[in-house]
Amino acid sequence: TIVANIEGSLLDSYGYVKDDFLIVDVVGIIYKLYNSIGMKVPTVSELREMVKCDELTWKMYELGATCSLNQCEKATTTKRVMKYKPKEIKELAAFIAGIRPGFKSLIDGFLNRLEYTNGEKAIDELLQDCFHYMLYQEAVMKIFSWLGIPMKDSYDTIKKISKKKLKGEALKKVEDTLKEHWVNNIGNLDNFEPVYKVIKDSARYSFNAPHALAMANDSLYEAWMKAHYTSKFYEVTLNHYQEKGDKNKVFALIKEVTSIFGFRMGTYEYGKDNSKFTIDDNTKTIYPV
């Protein structure tokens, strides 16, 4: 076996696939949460059934109870998810993809659930599964494929745009090629420019669909626990972030659980375990460390 340390862009130039090893904190939290109630972490299929039409879980997003919910806890994102009020996994995945920078010009209409069109009926029909928006890289590839551009060329073009490698003549060549295929399929260039702008923006910053869906699942694993086992959720997460020394997250969790769920902070008491956070369900009291 040969092990080599090679910079990512060099690997790309040789056509190799690189592996990224990431430590994802949310996975550990999810395990702790379900373990705390004696439940094995549900499979994704099981999770889908658990949250399907489950008003309590989806209410967490509507209320803005998003602290520690993956991808939704920044103040600006919380306001946005409260406005959008996702009610199914498909919508939450779309929301997570939609808050990327490349979707900035379209985000307001999306959050307000306004009917959207690309201006071309054929393109809209292609993108029915993502509300007619180019939310994902796959949506752009689907358009390229429909225009008759080979899949390999589609992938390479999106990759180069995303890494800002296409400039000047190279970028113009891509644009001219797209125009040619557009005219062949649609017959005119009336709506080419606005669609092409969205394609460029989307290719630069958009997620692929499985990435957005995986993040939505992570978020929902936590949202379900917060909705159905509220005290356990906060007990586990408060202790998790206390152990990590993340005082800001501890403060945010306490602020949320007291303001939204009506819990209160207790005081140090004899006979209580003061080495960690504990929550008394009967009195809705959080005993501090």
Task: Give the location of each predicted region.
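Noncatalytic, beta-rich nucleic-acid-contacting surfaces in large DNA/RNA-processing enzymes
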Residues: 1-289
